[in-house]
């Protein structure tokens, strides 16, 4: 870690991560005094030599899926498609490409739950939104499984996912099999709702159900299909957590009902009707037993059940190839201590997939294809995100649940905003350019906005970066090489970058190649994993990523890349085989240089086939 010579060297009080909280909320639409003070410090940070790297840029050429992806698949028995950032990376396209390989016949989700989500299209162009169902359901001749370490709300699964398959006449009964999953009940979702800040959770009950799971309470799918007395007993034991929470918080059923109505008040159904009915039920355990009897056990449309882990091992022993479809991502994994307070509750790294798939990794070769998204790399929820345009909890703190909560015409002129940001807020023409952006103001008919706020709102609008169902805005930012380097070191080298055709709309693009730490206090030192972080410290790609307590105060050092507006790569505008623009080559070269990844493909459109494979 480089030390800035000009920083205040006086040793101040040392704080541990447990004592350090996220920056206090003082968020405004316009640039405030605190933001100007941060910039006044950061603008004097000396440039790092890495801003001039790489010295030369590679030229990349297009190749076929058979020449790039298929050899990787054919060398291995287990292929994992995993998120490389904070989820929502556009993994579905790569998942479909792997699933379409003739030798890949077994496709599985093996952990996490319906808080994951992906949009996929079948050969007829029909759109499907899946949360827990594997994408291979739309490929003929593939068997799809939901493994026992997944968590499932079977009511939601039937209403939102299986219903789509039934209406589209997809023969899922022959293709979809469910393991002995842990059951997400209405009270898990209510605990999630009552304990979460706006825009900070998917409200799918993930933390509460995993708490039930690790404390060996709760129920699994097999309990619904067996002795009802055991089912009742286990539900009565587990539901005590919910009743205890209400007692501690002094909440009644009427209070909870009002909270549900408020959450659904803007027309987006975040709390489904059966959860509301649970709140209203006098005997809540009996309500659940009847609910599961009527809509799961006695439902002829419920998919077949099986021992998924056994089926997976049997498939491998027969020489079949298995694809594990990763939910969320590396940095959203609860098994990664750097962000563990703001992650999901399952291990969603590639190693987490491997562990929950329950096969002998000594016998079968595995490979990981990581997926990142750029431009407009995004994260939902709360937590640190050094490369974002605004603080990760900005929308949450402002009470913004959906884009509809913003002024109707606020920051809709994406082109003007990105032009101001990349051509005026940065100063690459100066000798002392250090990769820090100036907090300029953007003005439209609705008011004046800090340029970071304008970029965050405009990116969410322009790129559709909001939840497919919740419409919750994602917080966008730069491609982050500091975080991606660790992902590559742990589960690389293969990387697919989705949505790169978005770059068609930019004058320039930014890539985070390092962070500078600044907490706004002159002498405070933060001690994480035995290292002291002081104002002005630089954290580069390849160095240890600090914990979240420090990451809240890390600011991106941004390398600017030339755009390619005049030579768009979108599938609707580009002819297959056309040379890739210089700006694209600059972008890919920079990412490979700083992360050591091997980029195998880039996305260039919404359709499943809109992928450009990169000649290796």
From Swiss-Prot:
Highest taxon of the lineage: Eukaryota
Molecular function in Gene Ontology: adenylosuccinate synthase activity; GTP binding; magnesium ion binding
Give the start-end ranges of region Disordered: 1-26
Name the catalysed reactions: IMP + L-aspartate + GTP = N(6)-(1,2-dicarboxyethyl)-AMP + GDP + phosphate + 2 H(+)
Q: Where does Mg(2+) bind?
A: 88, 117
Q: Where does substrate bind?
A: 468-474
Q: Report the active site residues.
A: 88, 118
Kindly give the SMART domains that the UniProt entry links to this protein: Adenylsucc_synt (SM00788)
Q: What is its EC number?
A: 6.3.4.4
One biological process term from GO is: 'de novo' AMP biosynthetic process
Which residues bind IMP per the record?
88-91, 115-118, 202, 216, 328, 343, 472
Q: In which pathway does it act?
A: Purine metabolism; AMP biosynthesis via de novo pathway; AMP from IMP: step 1/2
Q: Where in the cell is it found?
A: Cytoplasm
Q: Which UniProt keywords apply?
A: Cytoplasm, GTP-binding, Ligase, Magnesium, Metal-binding, Nucleotide-binding, Purine biosynthesis
Residues bound to GTP? 87-93, 117-119, 474, 603-605
Q: Which InterPro entries match?
A: Adenylosuccin_syn_GTP-bd, Adenylosuccinate_synth_dom1, Adenylosuccinate_synth_dom2, Adenylosuccinate_synth_dom3, Adenylosuccinate_synthetase, P-loop_NTPase
Give the multimer and partner information: Homodimer.
More details: Parasitic protozoa lack the de novo purine biosynthesis pathway and rely exclusively on the salvage pathway for their purine nucleotide requirements.
Role summary: Plays an important role in the salvage pathway for purine nucleotide biosynthesis. Catalyzes the first committed step in the biosynthesis of AMP from IMP.
Query: What protein name is recorded for this chain?
Result: Adenylosuccinate synthetase 2
């Amino acid at each position: 870690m480089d030390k800035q010579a000009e920083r205040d060297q006086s040793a101040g009080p040392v704080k541990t991560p447990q004592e350090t909280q996220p920056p206090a909320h003082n968020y405004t639409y316009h640039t405030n005094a605190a933001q100007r003070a941060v910039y006044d410090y950061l603008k004097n940070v000396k440039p790092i030599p890495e801003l001039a790297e790489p010295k030369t840029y590679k030229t990349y050429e297009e190749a076929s899926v058979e020449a790039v992806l298929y050899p990787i698949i054919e060398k291995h028995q287990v292929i994992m498609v995993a998120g490389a950032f904070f989820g929502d990376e556009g993994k579905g396209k790569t998942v479909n490409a792997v699933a379409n390989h003739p030798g890949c016949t077994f496709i599985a989700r093996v952990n996490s739950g319906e808080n994951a989500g992906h949009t996929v299209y079948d050969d007829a162009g029909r759109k499907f939104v899946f949360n827990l169902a594997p994408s291979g359901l739309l490929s003929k001749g593939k068997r799809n499984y939901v493994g026992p370490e997944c968590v499932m709300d079977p009511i939601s699964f039937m209403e939102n996912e299986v219903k789509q398959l039934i209406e589209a006449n997809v023969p899922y009964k022959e293709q979809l099999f469910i393991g002995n999953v842990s059951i997400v009940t209405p009270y898990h979702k209510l605990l999630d709702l009552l304990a979460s800040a706006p825009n900070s959770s998917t409200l799918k009950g993930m933390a509460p159900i995993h708490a039930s799971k690790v404390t060996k309470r709760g129920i699994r799918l097999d309990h619904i299909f067996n002795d009802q007395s055991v089912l009742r007993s286990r539900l009565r034991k587990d539901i005590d957590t919910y009743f205890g929470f209400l007692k501690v918080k002094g909440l009644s059923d009427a209070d909870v009902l009002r909270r549900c109505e408020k959450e659904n008040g803007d027309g987006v159904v975040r709390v489904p009707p059966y959860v509301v009915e649970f709140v209203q039920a006098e005997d809540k355990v009996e309500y659940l037993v009847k609910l599961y009897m009527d809509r799961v056990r006695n439902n002829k449309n419920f998919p077949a059940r099986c021992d998924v882990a056994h089926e997976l091992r049997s498939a491998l022993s027969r020489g079949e190839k298995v694809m594990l479809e990763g939910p969320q991502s590396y940095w959203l994994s609860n098994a990664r201590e750097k962000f563990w307070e703001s992650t999901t509750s399952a291990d969603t790294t590639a190693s987490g997939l491997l562990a929950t798939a329950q096969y002998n990794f000594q016998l079968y070769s595995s490979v990981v294809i990581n997926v990142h998204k750029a431009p407009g790399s995004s994260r939902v929820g709360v937590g640190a995100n050094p490369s974002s345009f605004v603080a990760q909890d900005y929308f949450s703190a402002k009470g913004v649940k959906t884009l509809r909560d913003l002024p109707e015409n606020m920051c809709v002129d994406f082109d003007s905003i990105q032009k101001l940001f990349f051509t005026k807020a940065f100063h690459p023409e100066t000798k002392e350019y250090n990769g820090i952006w100036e907090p300029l103001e953007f003005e439209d008919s609705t008011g004046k906005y800090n340029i970071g706020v304008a970029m965050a709102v405009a990116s969410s609008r322009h790129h559709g970066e909001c939840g497919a169902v919740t419409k919750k805005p994602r917080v966008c930012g730069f491609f982050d090489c500091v975080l991606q380097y660790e992902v590559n070191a742990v589960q690389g080298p293969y990387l697919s970058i989705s949505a790169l055709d978005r770059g068609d709309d930019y004058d320039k693009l930014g890539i985070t190649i390092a962070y500078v730490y600044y907490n706004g206090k002159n002498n405070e030192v933060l001690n994480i994993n035995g290292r002291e972080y002081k104002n002005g410290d630089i954290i580069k790609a390849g160095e240890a990523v600090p914990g979240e307590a420090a990451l809240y105060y890390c600011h991106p050092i941004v390398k600017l890349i030339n755009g390619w507006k005049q030579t768009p790569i979108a599938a609707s505008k580009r002819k297959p085989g056309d040379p890739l623009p210089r700006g694209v080559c600059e972008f890919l070269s920079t990412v490979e240089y700083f992360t050591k990844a091997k980029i195998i493909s880039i996305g260039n459109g919404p359709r499943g086939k809109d992928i450009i494979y990169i000649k290796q």
